[in-house]
Amino acid sequence: MFTFNRLVDFQEFDPLCHFMSQRYRYSNNEFRTKGSLMYPKQAKPVSAKTLVIDLLSTMPARHPVPVGALVRAAALFGIGENSMRVALARLRSSASIESDTRGFYRLSRKAQPVNRKVRSWPTLEQGVCDWDGSYLAVETSGLPRRDRRAAKVRDRALRLLGFERLSPALMVRPNNLVGGATTCRERLVELGFAPTPVLFQLNDLDPKLEQRARNLWATADLEARYAETRANLERSTARLPERSLDEAMAESFQIGGEAVRQLVLDPLLPKEIIDTAARSAVVEVMRQYDRVGREAWKQWAGASVELERSPVDMGTLDSVPSEVPGLASR
């Protein structure tokens, strides 16, 4: 499915920030349309810029896409050719995408660290291990704050790996990621955290602080979203065979995007804190939905191209990372 490779430009177009605050709700099953797209009444229509990034991110690594194919896909969502060409020009100018051959585009190299993070959703649970009760902690008091862009990137990196603030100078998450502190530190750096974080294992919290740490994540909200997302995927899977090809492409793009966003931003909490079986169920249903989505988009991609995942909408947004679903309000 589509990934949020739109992390590419941190100034004019900040796709990861857009990605992280998108919160579509499908509970009332009410949809409206634009072009062939069916999307929830609360959701925003797809923009030309984000559609370009989403489409390019589904292709095999470094595989270029002709502008004609992008224009055809845009028509499904009521986006005109001129709008797409303007979006392509702006994204290329901001180094979000690149082109070696006239009329063919692919994601830039700057997008790859986050793209790898998103591609991992089908196997995300392979990245967790049993929890020994300790936490990974990042000390933040010495970090420079004058560079707001760098500070935003650090915040996003921490949120992507499930960290939450335990105290004014301490971000924590359960120590249940494979590789422990060393691997987590490397992943933060790969996601743009600079300078290298002061990251360490935190043990033996007093009972009061331990309870406070466990309550940093809104687990009831997360579990409710697991159930809702699974139900949405199952309903859409049942509907898609009755849709036209264009409608199936558009619906799988929207519904799948919500599920992938949720999985990529999941804090991957251990079973001692959250219902991990419910999370696993969403991953499994999404794997099945991805196969359906790929089939719908096969004709668009062409017989010679094996999509890495079916295109899905990763959203457009302007909010800060604290909008990530499942974080306890403070």
Which functions belong to the PLM regions below?
Residues 210-330:
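C-terminal regulatory/effector modules of DNA-binding transcriptional regulators
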Residues 63-73:
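Short acidic, hydrophobic short linear motifs in intrinsically disordered regions
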Residues 114-135:
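Short, amphipathic alpha-helical interaction segments positioned at domain boundaries
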Residues 18-55:
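Short alpha-helical segments that sit at the start of domains
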Residues 92-102:
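A short, conserved structural fragment
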Residues 143-239:
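Mid-protein regulatory/catalytic core that forms ligand/cofactor-binding pockets
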Residues 103-108:
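Minor-groove-contacting beta-hairpin "wing" of winged helix-turn-helix DNA-binding domains
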Residues 85-89, 97, 155:
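Short, hydrophobic-biased segments on the C-terminal half of alpha helices
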